[in-house]
């Protein structure tokens, strides 16, 4: 089952978020992570969704709204997607992505956009299998801003 996360899900969502951070080589920082998630849950712009197996949260995703100003339509950015190691290979990521697409469509979105690490071949395989295509039209740049 997949449903929108609420503040009541903070413990489970934080646990998965910490595991996600560790997967990408970041420190766990449990207290900071929980505060970060709680702040995001209280904001109304982004959406967290949890995948459940009974009472256990086994995956999460975080969607952020944006706009395609050329098409003058909303888009959603899949900022985070993580499935617990114990639940991988069971279709959880596919179910989360399907839910994300249905949610985005319900808002009139033009597209769902995501990014993944170059070496995350398992995720790339899933995305390609589900019809996601690599963006070659634009180059994306970023600049880190020091506090």
Q: Language-model segments: what does each one mean?
A:
Residues 97, 104-115:
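Conserved GNAT acetyl-CoA-binding A-motif
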Residues 94, 118-137, 143:
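Conserved active-site alpha-helix within GNAT-family acetyltransferase domains
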Residues 55, 91-93, 108, 120:
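Conserved G/P- and acidic residue-centered "switch" motifs that form tight phosphate/ATP-binding loops
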Residues 88, 110-123, 142-145:
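Conserved beta-strand-loop-alpha-helix junction that forms the acyl-donor binding cleft
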Residues 83, 89-102, 125, 129:
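Conserved acetyl-CoA-binding loop-helix of GNAT-fold acetyltransferases
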Residues 4-73, 79, 97-99, 103, ...:
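Acetyl-CoA-dependent GNAT
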Residues 5, 81-83, 116:
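Hydrophobic adenine-recognition pocket in adenosine-nucleotide-binding enzymes
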């Amino acid at each position: 089952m997949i449903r929108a996360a609420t503040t009541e899900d903070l413990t489970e969502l934080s646990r998965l978020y910490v595991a996600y951070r560790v997967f990408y080589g970041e420190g766990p920082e449990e207290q900071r992570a929980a505060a970060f998630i709680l702040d995001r849950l209280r904001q109304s712009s982004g959406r967290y969704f949890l995948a459940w197996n009974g009472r256990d949260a086994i995956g999460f995703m975080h969607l952020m709204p944006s706009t395609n100003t050329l098409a003058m339509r909303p888009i959603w950015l899949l900022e985070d997607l993580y499935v617990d190691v114990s639940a991988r290979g069971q279709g959880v990521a596919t179910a989360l992505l399907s839910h994300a697409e249905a949610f985005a469509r319900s808002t009139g979105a033009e597209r769902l956009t995501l990014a993944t690490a170059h070496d995350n071949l398992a995720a790339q395989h899933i995305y390609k299998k589900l019809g996601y295509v690599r963006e070659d039209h634009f180059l994306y740049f970023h600049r880190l801003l020091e506090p």
